[in-house]
């Protein structure tokens, strides 16, 4: 066993038998190689593992050197928002659909992971967004996002009127179905579907992408990631929401603003040694191949 990683966490929310099979294979393989392994509690319960060290996501973040997330991008997003708070590296085995964030092929995961455990990997720091719903002199409601923060109506679709301030300076007003505020990581997700630009992961930038704006002049805007975005609302409705990674919703009440900024911590995401971002784009998005 090498000294690059000593304690490995196994993470994920198994939804079908193939994912559970991968979890079990990974656990037994790591134990056989002599690593200390800590398994997320739900996985250990589903696999009926006995005499195994288990923990919550937060405990895995505190104790492990590396977390292996088995599942799709949704599993990775859910785990990464918690794990990003800790000094832990994260890699994913794809058991979902696209797999932009989960690089390892489940059929070749052992060999790829063996190389990673020997220290042969590519490391990236992916920043998160922090969203606050706040009113003057009131307690804030806060969440974070790896991909995007989305302003949208609650249960019934309708037009929203709002103003956007960047670093407390008025930028524009808009009537639309909402607004997507995306990180470079999220630029290939919901933002892409809404016509937003693709940003390479190392860019220190945030995109603001309108959702069905009621004007032909509204276009996506790219700003520095050090900027703070404030959303203000002109209506008296109280059915608006902010969604983080399409997994966490924060309701917006009358008189409240939304403040979005770059988070203080980041995700330590690692990839196999042969990883290429542009090859991932070509494969996942069906781009044409090289001509010569």
Swiss-Prot record:
Active site positions: 73 (proton acceptor)
Cofactor: a divalent metal cation
InterPro entries according to UniProt: ATP-NAD_kinase_N (IPR017438), ATP-NAD_kinase_PpnK-typ_C (IPR017437), NAD/diacylglycerol_kinase_sf (IPR016064), NADK (IPR002504)
This protein's name: NAD kinase
Listed GO biological process terms: NAD metabolic process; NADP biosynthetic process
Entry GO terms, CC: cytoplasm
Organism, scientific name: Escherichia coli (strain SMS-3-5 / SECEC)
Functional description taken from the UniProt entry: Involved in the regulation of the intracellular balance of NAD and NADP, and is a key enzyme in the biosynthesis of NADP. Catalyzes specifically the phosphorylation on 2'-hydroxyl of the adenosine moiety of NAD to yield NADP.
Database matches in Pfam families: NAD_kinase, NAD_kinase_C
Family: Belongs to the NAD kinase family.
EC numbers, comma separated: 2.7.1.23
Binding site for NAD(+): 73-74, 147-148, 158, 175, 177, 188-193, 247
Subcellular location: Cytoplasm
Molecular functions per Gene Ontology: ATP binding; metal ion binding; NAD binding; NAD+ kinase activity
Keyword DNA damage assigned: no
Predominant place of localization: cytoplasm
Sorted UniProt keywords: ATP-binding, Cytoplasm, Kinase, NAD, NADP, Nucleotide-binding, Transferase
Catalytic activity, as annotated: NAD(+) + ATP = ADP + NADP(+) + H(+)
